[in-house]
Regions:
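Long, charge-rich, low-complexity alpha-helical segments
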Residues: 30-94
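Acidic, low-complexity/disordered tracts enriched in E/D and polar residues
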Residues: 1-44
Length: 94
């Protein structure tokens, strides 16, 4: 998987908002907000996409476990749920 280019993560109060930088990426009917953990995962996914051209659920799980004290099963569950929401929002590609 890889993130779609052209999105920037912005912090607004206690939440993070994903903003499309070009008019073709902007959908005025929905706003994509992340909590701190999802924002961390997005930043990792973007970094991996730039560096290697892709990211995997396993790599995000490893990054999540390195950053936060979370059990492997919970980390993978959180990552899979987050990736599913990104697919639904159409901000990643297979």
């Amino acid at each position: 998987m890889r993130t779609i280019e052209g999105f920037k993560l912005r912090k607004l109060g206690n939440e993070f908002i994903l903003v499309g930088e070009s008019m073709s990426l902007i959908n005025f009917n929905k706003m994509i907000t992340f909590n701190e953990t999802a924002a961390f995962l997005w930043e990792q996914a973007q970094k991996m996409s730039v560096e290697t051209g892709r990211f995997t659920a396993e790599a995000l799980c490893d990054a999540l476990r390195a950053e936060y004290e979370v059990m492997p099963e919970q980390a993978m569950s959180d990552v899979e749920s987050t990736i599913a929401s990104w697919r639904e929002a159409e901000i990643i590609e297979a």
